[in-house]
Structures are given as structure tokens and as C-alpha cells.
Design a protein with these regions (language model features):
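Conserved nucleotide-sugar phosphate-binding/catalytic loop shared by glycosyltransferases and other
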Residues: 2-7, 27-80, 309
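Glycosyltransferases and closely related glycan-assembly transferases
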Residues: 22, 83-97, 104-120, 133-137
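Active-site-proximal region of nucleotide-activated glycan assembly enzymes
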Residues: 31, 50, 113-174
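Donor-nucleotide binding loops and adjacent catalytic segments primarily
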Residues: 43, 47, 173-260, 291-295, ...
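Acidic donor-binding loop of glycosyltransferase active sites
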Residues: 94-96, 240, 253-268, 275-276
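Conserved donor-binding/catalytic loop of nucleotide-activated donor transferases
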Residues: 115, 253-255, 271-280, 300
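A short, well-ordered alpha-helix in the C-terminal region of glycosyltransferases
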Residues: 329-343
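C-terminal alpha-helical cap of glycosyltransferases
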Residues: 342-359
Length: 359
């Protein structure tokens, strides 16, 4: 049983682990547990994967009337969700429960620990999420994306890196050039703010476009689905605008630098691909964990961070141009990013899961 979701940062590690298990042991039953209100409610049925969706959503951490109302509704839904998880565990008798974080993983992890089912947690962020902080100590094992996670937990962890899709570091610059109709010989900036896009990033890059065009610098720009219609008219021969990019491996292969939010999974993919980055952490992420993720990359010399409060078109342009003009620095940052990458993380995690499951 693999439980996790709510956002792509928790769902896609679960899918990567599940795919690796299935590829290596096709007769193994992999069942996903998520939330009716998370991204997984769309993705799991689309992929035809065995799954159960729980009627729970995330805990709201503000004290607005709307948040209080949602939290009261959450409390009322927990008993039903708990019964559903218990029933699922009775019928499945899982050899191991894997939690990849997010509110969808909390109840399966709790039941697994309580019923003495081997239960492991995969934590993506430098600062561990609430579910990990609650259950790390009684869990069988914690597999962490970075060593920084140990600072915040009173238990031993295994630093494995984060599981990324196996194909992510096998992209082709030539294929990317053809796919996005851009010149593989030109410098290319890849800007994206996650699947939903980032309004501050989308806004800040617009005044920079003339300078990029004048210098022959290309921009591959994922706007987010909701922002695409308002921005698509800005496309030109050197600016390619997409609402959402599925072919991330080829996009990474084409890119010389990425301008992105600082979600753990994004940073793991950039590291595996050895791409220097300019990071804009989402300031309202829980416990400001994206800033902590970004700081890990900055300390290693793999990235430059601009806080959202400090973001302007001027300093974004200065940072992009400064890096692209400094080949030595760009190369060094790429090498440092690659040194952080753990392309075998998924394999290592699954090796450990098999050992736990087999006792």
C-alpha cells in the first residue's frame, strides 16, 4: 500500500516508487491511497491504477472563518476515512505501507503503525511535513530526500534522495528542440511555477522578454493552465509558451538554466539533470519549507535564491543575464546540482522497502 498525495510533490514520488516495484516484481499488488480532493483523484483513474480515495482534505492553518469551517468538516470526516483505511488493511493484508506525505498519508501510516504492519515514510522536503514529524519515531524507517531533514527529527533517517521518474534524466536536447520548436544551439531559460503556474513569476518575467529577445536568449515558459490564455499572445520565435508541459525530460535537456519555485520534487529533478537554477520559494508553503529546500541548493552552490518579497523584473533580469554571461559559474553550478542528484534514489528506496516487507 502506498499512501500520499494532495499535491504533485507527494503524489509523484508515490507513483515513482510504485512503478519501480511493479517493474521489478510484476506480480506484486500495489494499491494507492489518496484523497478525493487531491491531484490523485484525477491522475490515478487516468492511469488505471488500483486506488482508494479518502474523504479528507488538508488541515487549514489559518484562523479565518472559512478555514475554521473546513477544519470542522475535516474532523467530521476523519472517523469515516479511518474506518475505510482499517477495512482496506483487513482486506489487503499489506506486507508494507509506504507513506509519501501529505494529508492523504496520515491515516494509513497511523493504522499501519498501530497494527504493527511494517510502515515506512518517504520525506521529500528539507523541513519534514506534519505527518512525518508526527510518525517518524514509531515508523519502521524514514527515507529522506536530504540530510537536512535529520535536524528536525529525533530519530534516525536514511538519506536516499527523492524518487524521480526514471526517464527524467534521459531527455534529448534534439528532441526537445523539435518538440518545442526552439533552436538547440541557443541559450534557453526554462521558467515554470509548478503545474498551477506562479503568478509572481509570470508577472516578473514579462518586462524581461525584450532583453532576452535582443540577446537571442530563448524562453520555454510553462504558465500554468489558468494563466495561459492571458499570456499566450506573448509567444514569438524565441519564446515558447505552454499551459502545461508533460515532456519534462526533454524540456530539461534543452535548458541551460531554470527559473522555478522550490518544491522538493522539482529540485530533485533539476539536481539529477545537473541544471543550475534561480529559485523563488513559495512564501506561504507550510512552515516555509520551500525556503528551506532552496537554502540547501544555495549552500551547495547549485542555485541562486530570490525571495518573493524581493522579486522584481530588474533583479530577475540581472540574475538571468549575469548567469548566462558567466559560463564558468554556470558550469560550476550545474556540476554542484549534479553532485546533489541521486538518480538511483528510487531503486535504493525500493530495495529498502522490499527488505522491510520481507522482514
Amino acid at each position: 500500500m502506498i499512501a500520499g498525495g494532495g499535491t504533485g510533490g507527494h503524489l509523484y514520488p508515490a507513483l515513482a516508487i510504485g512503478a519501480e516495484i511493479t517493474n521489478r516484481r510484476p506480480n506484486t499488488t500495489v494499491h494507492y491511497v489518496g484523497s478525493k480532493f487531491g491531484l490523485e483523484a484525477r491522475v490515478l483513474p487516468e492511469r488505471g491504477l488500483s486506488h482508494t480515495l479518502l474523504p479528507i482534505s488538508g488541515l487549514q492553518r489559518s484562523f479565518s472563518p472559512r478555514s475554521i469551517g473546513r477544519n470542522l468538516m475535516l474532523v467530521s470526516r476523519v472517523p469515516l476515512a479511518l474506518l475505510k483505511v482499517r477495512s482496506l488493511c483487513r482486506s489487503m493484508e499489506p506486507n508494507v505501507i509506504v507513506g509519501t506525505g501529505g494529508y492523504a498519508s496520515a491515516l494509513p501510516i497511523k493504522v499501519g503503525i498501530g497494527w504493527k504492519i511494517p510502515t515506512v515514510i518517504q520525506e521529500q522536503n528539507s523541513y519534514p511535513g506534519l505527518t512525518t514529524r508526527l510518525f517518524a519515531e514509531p515508523a519502521t524507517a524514514v527515507y529522506a530526500g536530504t540530510s537536512d531533514t535529520s535536524t528536525y527529527l529525533d530519530t534516525d533517517i536514511d538519506v536516499t534522495g527523492n524518487p524521480v521518474r526514471s526517464e527524467i534524466h534521459n531527455g534529448s536536447k534534439t528532441v526537445g528542440s523539435e518538440l518545442f520548436r526552439l533552436d538547440s544551439e541557443r541559450k534557453t531559460v526554462f521558467l515554470f511555477g509548478g503545474s498551477q503556474g506562479s503568478v509572481p513569476l509570470n508577472r516578473a518575467i514579462q518586462p524581461v522578454l525584450p532583453t532576452l529577445q535582443d540577446r537571442g536568449i530563448q524562453l520555454l515558459w510553462q504558465t500554468g493552465v489558468n494563466n495561459y490564455e492571458a499570456l499566450k499572445e506573448l509567444e514569438s520565435d524565441t519564446i515558447r509558451i505552454k499551459p502545461y508541459i508533460k515532456e519534462m525530460a526533454h524540456a530539461y535537456a534543452l535548458s541551460d538554466i531554470a527559473v522555478v519555485r522550490a518544491g522538493a520534487l522539482t529540485l530533485s529533478e533539476l539536481s539529477v539533470c545537473g541544471i543550475p537554477s534561480i529559485l523563488l520559494p513559495f512564501p506561504r508553503a507550510t512552515a516555509d519549507h520551500q525556503t528551506k529546500n532552496a537554502e540547501t541548493m544555495v549552500r551547495a552552490g547549485a542555485a541562486i535564491m530570490i525571495r518573493q518579497a524581493d522579486l522584481t523584473a530588474s533583479n530577475l533580469q540581472e540574475t538571468i543575464i549575469g548567469l548566462l554571461d558567466d559560463t564558468d559559474k554556470l558550469t560550476a553550478m550545474g556540476a554542484q546540482a549534479l553532485s546533489l542528484g541521486k538518480p538511483k534514489a528510487t531503486k535504493e528506496i525500493v530495495d529498502k522497502i522490499f527488505k522491510v516487507a520481507l522482514g
